[in-house]
């Protein structure tokens, strides 16, 4: 089984992905973990590699290529990243998009990173705008198009302990034999 969990910063991807992976006996592969691996391979910290990525688009492409390769070549994976659903493409059994209003996500990020909510909100907005442009330019992906996702959950509506339960019920009920069709992923340029 290949599950993907995607969403913007602060939506609860990692928390939810950890729980889902444990429940379904899947290996949790995080885009953040792969980014840290890329940094280590280059003898850099994640912060240093992130700074380089601002000037060198090949760093993003290397990360995305590695995530796509994992999605296509490995079994029993939960792939978690902003683009996981897009990168896994039709190899994914279930694609999940988690989201929450910006003010809620900024509050979560502020708590996690020990900064003010206003700072977290402005940084998040700037980051999201930058990433949306890059994804469109690199791969022709409109990150605001959620039509490819099988499940979309506003994580602000339920306690964080309940969100995985909601998804677990839907995923456990999934029967590939009775699947009448997922939304295809079309016109994406996997140019790494």
Swiss-Prot record:
It holds the Pfam family Cytidylate_kin2. Belongs to the cytidylate kinase family. Type 2 subfamily. The keyword Nucleotide-binding applies. This is Cytidylate kinase. Keywords: ATP-binding, Cytoplasm, Kinase, Nucleotide-binding, Transferase. It comes from the Archaea. ATP binds at residues 7-15. NCBIfam families: cyt_kin_arch. It catalyses: CMP + ATP = CDP + ADP; dCMP + ATP = dCDP + ADP. It is an enzyme of class 2 (transferase). GO terms for biological process: pyrimidine nucleotide metabolic process. The lineage of its organism: Archaea, Methanobacteriati, Methanobacteriota, Stenosarchaea group, Halobacteria.
């Amino acid at each position: 089984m290949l599950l993907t969990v995607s969403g913007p910063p602060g939506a609860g991807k990692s928390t939810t992905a950890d729980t889902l992976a444990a429940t379904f006996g899947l290996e949790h592969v995080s885009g953040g973990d792969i980014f840290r691996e890329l940094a280590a391979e280059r003898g850099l910290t994640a912060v240093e590699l992130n700074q380089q990525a601002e000037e060198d688009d090949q760093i993003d492409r290397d990360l995305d290529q590695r995530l796509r390769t994992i999605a296509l070549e490995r079994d029993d994976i939960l792939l978690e990243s902003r683009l996981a659903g897009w990168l896994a493409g039709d190899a994914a059994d279930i694609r999940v998009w988690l989201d929450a209003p910006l003010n809620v996500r900024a509050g979560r990020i502020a708590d996690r990173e020990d900064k003010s909510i206003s700072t977290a909100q402005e940084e998040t907005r700037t980051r999201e705008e930058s990433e949306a442009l890059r994804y469109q330019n690199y791969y022709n992906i409109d990150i605001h198009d959620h039509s490819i996702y099988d499940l979309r959950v506003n994580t602000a509506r339920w306690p964080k302990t309940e969100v995985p339960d909601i998804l677990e019920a839907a995923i456990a009920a999934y029967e590939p034999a009775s699947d009448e069709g997922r939304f295809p992923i079309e016109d994406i340029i996997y140019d790494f």
